[in-house]
Amino acid sequence: MADKFYRPTYLKVDLEAILKNYQVLGKLQPNKTVMPVIKANAYGMGSVNVGHYLKKHGAEFFAVATLDEAIELRMHGIDTKILILGVVMPKDINKAIQHRVALTVPSYAWLNEAIKYLDEDLEKDLWLHVKIDTGMGRLGVKSAEDYQKTVALIQSHEHLIFEGVFTHFAQADEDSPHTKEQYEIFENWVDTIPHPSYVHAQNSAGTILFDAPICNMVRTGISLYGYYPSEYVEEQTNAELYPSAEWITEIVDIKYLNIGDTVSYGSTYTAEKSEKIAILPVGYADGFPRMMQGTNVEVNGQQCTIIGRVCMDQMMIALPENEDINVGDKVTLLNREHSGPQSLLSHAKQQQTINYEVLCRIGRRVPRIYEPEKVFDIVNELQK
């Protein structure tokens, strides 16, 4: 891991806040295992550092999306249980066994094909979680009969372990009857045969708002990092979450515009008066998109507007008159508030998307600085 970076743009990640959220979510669903979802580089926070910190504080089972993500965790010393939520190609099943990870069974056909690739001299077990499609329209078996047939095939093989069964809610973050309907289907099908070790259905929204008595594990993603899955969820709960990310940059240059001067590509901004502007070393290649033109960043407590188009690596802001703002002053792009102009919610609205996507867009060339001080670390992906 690198201990330096050479551009003053970075994402501060508060691991203690993530731990608090892990504990809050666990208290909402007592007697259930909390499975932290650390796919997509832990929603941009850094899966290795997040994984190690949560493991140190009791997490025993992580979820990722791909075999590559699971291998990354193993290569960095995370030896907990890991479930891959996405599809692993049948031909790669022995690689999954080698790294001791659990796989999702998306269909009977997948399982039947995967078995063909098992090494003949296999000595290690493979843990499997059967996915049931109760209304997401994505992965999963589509009937109780298919579920029973799939489990029977697993149990007919000496080294395949039926460890879990799960589904995924499509509208748990909305005021919709669909979640209850999905849960009832899931419960009915799961109850047709003896339960495996893990039964899980609740995502972040389901964990916060929905009781699922048949389940003994919850999968927490966005809320693990301190963000509500939707405004509806935030309105419906008293659970306090702690935002964990703060995106900071610095002013690298200041210049003065005359009346009529233009700024950035397309000359979309024209100075109507003499004004002072600052250049920031961050752009859409870092995950700060062009559509953020006209929104605000914070400098020394002042709201400053982004003028002209956001460039690949830089952007410009207008500075208020008579304010003592200089090269080297810190600029907040994203703060740890739940609302306000630099909140993740505000970013999502401005970008016409969801908070998940905003976090996942923050690029690999933005170093992550981990707090608190007792675990201080810097990860610069470009110097690994």
UniProtKB/Swiss-Prot annotation:
Record family assignment: Belongs to the alanine racemase family.
A single MF term (Gene Ontology): pyridoxal phosphate binding
GO cellular component: cytosol
HAMAP family in UniProt: Ala_racemase (MF_01201)
Keyword set includes Isomerase: yes
One Pfam family this sequence matches: Ala_racemase_N
UniProt cross-references to SMART domains, sorted A to Z: Ala_racemase_C
GO biological process, one term: D-alanine biosynthetic process
Cofactor: pyridoxal 5'-phosphate
Pathway entry: Amino-acid biosynthesis; D-alanine biosynthesis; D-alanine from L-alanine: step 1/1
Organism per entry: Staphylococcus carnosus (strain TM300)
Keywords on record: Isomerase, Pyridoxal phosphate
Binding site for substrate: 138, 312
Listed EC numbers: 5.1.1.1
Record-given protein name: Alanine racemase
Cited InterPro entries: Ala_racemase, Ala_racemase/Decarboxylase_C, Ala_racemase_C, Ala_racemase_N, PLP-binding_barrel
Alphabetical list of Gene3D superfamilies matching this protein: Alanine racemase (3.20.20.10), Lyase, Ornithine Decarboxylase, Chain A, domain 1 (2.40.37.10)
Function: Catalyzes the interconversion of L-alanine and D-alanine. May also act on other amino acids.
Record has Isomerase as a keyword: yes
List of catalytic residues: 39, 265
Enzyme's top EC category: isomerase
Catalytic function, reaction form: L-alanine = D-alanine
Modified residues (N6-(pyridoxal phosphate)lysine): 39
